[in-house]
Curated annotation (Swiss-Prot):
Residues that, per the record, bind Zn(2+) 2: C181, C184, C207, C210
GO BP terms, alphabetized: chaperone cofactor-dependent protein refolding; DNA replication; protein refolding; response to heat
Description of its domains: The J domain is necessary and sufficient to stimulate DnaK ATPase activity. Zinc center 1 plays an important role in the autonomous, DnaK-independent chaperone activity of DnaJ. Zinc center 2 is essential for interaction with DnaK and for DnaJ activity.
Free-text cofactor note: Binds 2 Zn(2+) ions per monomer.
Lineage top rank: taxon: Bacteria
CXXCXGXG motif repeats: from-to residues: 165-172, 181-188, 207-214, 221-228
Keyword hit for Zinc: yes
Name assigned to this protein: Chaperone protein DnaJ
Protein keywords: Chaperone, Cytoplasm, DNA replication, Metal-binding, Repeat, Stress response, Zinc, Zinc-finger
Protein role: Participates actively in the response to hyperosmotic and heat shock by preventing the aggregation of stress-denatured proteins and by disaggregating proteins, also in an autonomous, DnaK-independent fashion. Unfolded proteins bind initially to DnaJ; upon interaction with the DnaJ-bound protein, DnaK hydrolyzes its bound ATP, resulting in the formation of a stable complex. GrpE releases ADP from DnaK; ATP binding to DnaK triggers the release of the substrate protein, thus completing the reaction cycle.
Ranges where the J domain occurs: 4-69
Length: 395
């Protein structure tokens, strides 16, 4: 029985073309016959990866495969396909790029001709697959406040999705049993031989009767109409780390839609949506708060209560603080996603200018303005360049 092409390459069903190409090249370099002489198992894995890549790298074939499984691309993906195979029509750029990775860099450097450091680094695990077609991935958006993002949070999500039918236990059969497909005798494949002037060719395709599963439902379950799945609701707990950003996503393996007739579950993709805060702005892992003070407080200095993500804290504003000065409260910002520690809480200080001062206020200001200390020194103001002033704002 053919394995699921996404499983062969070790990628999810929502994988991008670049992710598919990267996964394929890693497998092709690992199992290439030149690196595994007289190894029949490696040869089969190499052919399998070629076949999967030929389908998933082609938009039309991938669409048909996603909709109909192996039956939708039966005649197009032979075991010899793919950019390294005899019958494939893969991207020539991939061919030369992959061969250069395999045989180029290492040989020029005098080391291993295969560059094992690159070949075997990184990578991800593959998921095992039970019988049946895989369930589809499920994508949801999760709104988070800045307070939740700052520390990380555990969320319990109620999700509507396809679940295994509880009447037939997901088999799709009224009796709970599946029978061997009479067309392919349980192999999931059909073979067609044709003779040409070059010899006999055998084309292997997914069985049209069972869709490549090797089993068929004789007596369908009436609750799920033989599909083995139905619409349901489930609860999932997800741990969101501190420091995530809008658009980041987490993939929960096997938490997506159930596969028909015992097929493996798809993945649940949780996309983060950051809710705009009422009084704070985010700048990386720092939090910015705008504080407006009176002219007197700016000149004389003062102590104020400052709101932060963890509550209010006391902060001293020094005398002669200039407009747009940024004061820093360390480690009161957002937790770093990929490192220990937290960002800072930045307080940008500005002066309050009354729009409708009283007559008495105006007279007092006129008297105050007579002082030489209250009039800006134009020469000193222009001694600092523009970029130095900007630097002062964000220092």
């Amino acid at each position: 029985m053919k394995r699921d092409y996404y499983e062969v390459l070790g990628v999810g069903r929502s994988a991008t073309k670049d992710e598919i190409k990267k996964a394929y090249r890693k497998l092709a370099m690992k199992y290439h016959p030149d690196k595994n002489p007289d190894n029949s198992e490696a040869e089969e894995k190499f052919k399998e990866a070629n076949e999967a890549y030929e389908v998933l790298s082609n938009d039309d074939k991938r669409r048909r495969y996603d909709q109909f499984g192996h039956a939708g691309v039966g005649s197009s993906a032979s075991s010899q396909g793919g950019p390294f195979g005899g019958g494939g029509t893969g991207d020539l750029g991939d061919i030369f790029s992959a061969f250069n990775d395999m045989f180029g860099g290492g040989a020029r450097g005098g080391g291993s001709p295969f560059g094992f450091e690159d070949v075997f680094s990184g990578g991800g695990g593959r998921r095992s697959r039970s019988a049946g077609v895989s369930g589809s991935d499920l994508k949801i958006r999760l709104k988070l406040s800045l307070e939740e993002i700052a520390k990380g949070v555990e969320k319990t999500l109620k999700i509507k999705k396809q679940v295994a039918c509880d009447v037939c236990n997901g088999t799709g059969s009224k009796t709970g049993e599946l029978e061997t497909c009479p067309t392919c005798q349980g192999t999931g494949e059909v073979r067609q031989a044709s003779k040409t002037m070059f010899g006999q060719f055998v084309n292997i395709a997914a069985c049209p009767t069972c869709g490549g599963e090797g089993r068929v439902v004789k007596e369908r379950c009436t609750a799920c109409h033989g599909e083995g799945i139905k619409q349901g609701e489930t609860t999932v707990k997800v741990n969101i780390p501190a420091g995530v950003e809008d658009g980041n996503y987490l993939t929960l393996r096997g938490q997506g839609n159930a596969g028909p007739r015992g097929g493996m579950n798809g993945d649940l993709i949780v996309v983060i949506e950051e809710v705009e805060h009422k009084i704070f702005a985010r700048r990386g892992d720092d939090v910015v708060y705008n504080l407006t003070l009176s002219y007197a407080d700016m000149v004389l200095g003062t102590k104020v209560d400052i709101p932060t993500l963890e509550g209010r804290v006391k902060m001293t504003v020094p005398p002669a603080t200039q407009p747009n000065t940024v004061l820093r409260i360390s480690a009161k910002g957002i937790g770093h996603l990929k490192a220990p520690g937290r960002g800072d809480h930045l307080v940008r200080v500005n002066v309050f200018v009354p729009k409708d001062p009283s007559h008495q206020d105006k007279e007092l200001l006129k008297e105050l303005n007579k002082s030489v200390h209250m009039v800006p020194d134009e020469k000193k103001e222009h001694e600092k360049g523009f970029y130095e002033k900007v630097k002062d704002i964000f220092s």
